[in-house]
Amino acid sequence: MSKKRSSPNRNVQIADQIQRDLSELIMREVKDPRIGIVTIQSVELTPDYAHAKVYFTALTGTPADTQEALNHAAGHLHNLLFKRLHIHTVPTLHFHYDQTIEKAVAMSRLIDEANATRAKDD
């Protein structure tokens, strides 16, 4: 007997819904002062929906403190998601700071430096 697998499209839809719901729940329900203005950038689900990597950026506070506070609130957020989502398994949440912006700025800076060096050599 074959196991029923969820489609990749369904996985994306559920991840998007979790992203939207978490954004709202963090803003309205989480009262930890270490969590300032947070943006949920993306959510990656395992195929069995058991775990979700939640990538965020923070405008206030340090990324480490914010990550610690979000992971501390993960159980509460999981329970709130369970009430909102209509799926059999609500994933365990694992929050990670999204370093994409910092890496892009650093890469851009390196490109600018390389171009400036090349211009001086010409």
Curated annotation (Swiss-Prot):
* Domain of life from the UniProt record: Bacteria
For this UniProt record, the keywords arranged alphabetically read as follows: Cytoplasm, Ribosome biogenesis
Matching entries from InterPro entries are given as: KH_dom-like_a/b, RbfA, RbfA_dom_sf
GO:BP terms for this protein?
maturation of SSU-rRNA
Using the record, list the residue span of the signal peptide; answer none if the entry has no such feature. none
The molecular function terms in GO held by this entry are:
ribosomal small subunit binding
* One Gene Ontology CC term in the entry: cytosol
Cell compartment(s), UniProt: Cytoplasm
Where does this chain mainly localize? cytoplasm
The family this protein is said to belong to: Belongs to the RbfA family.
What is the stated purpose of this protein? One of several proteins that assist in the late maturation steps of the functional core of the 30S ribosomal subunit. Associates with free 30S ribosomal subunits (but not with 30S subunits that are part of 70S ribosomes or polysomes). Required for efficient processing of 16S rRNA. May interact with the 5'-terminal helix region of 16S rRNA.
Quaternary organization? Monomer. Binds 30S ribosomal subunits, but not 50S ribosomal subunits or 70S ribosomes.
* PANTHER family documented for this protein: RIBOSOME-BINDING FACTOR A, CHLOROPLASTIC-RELATED
Q: What is this protein called?
A: Ribosome-binding factor A
Organism source for this protein?
Burkholderia mallei (strain ATCC 23344)
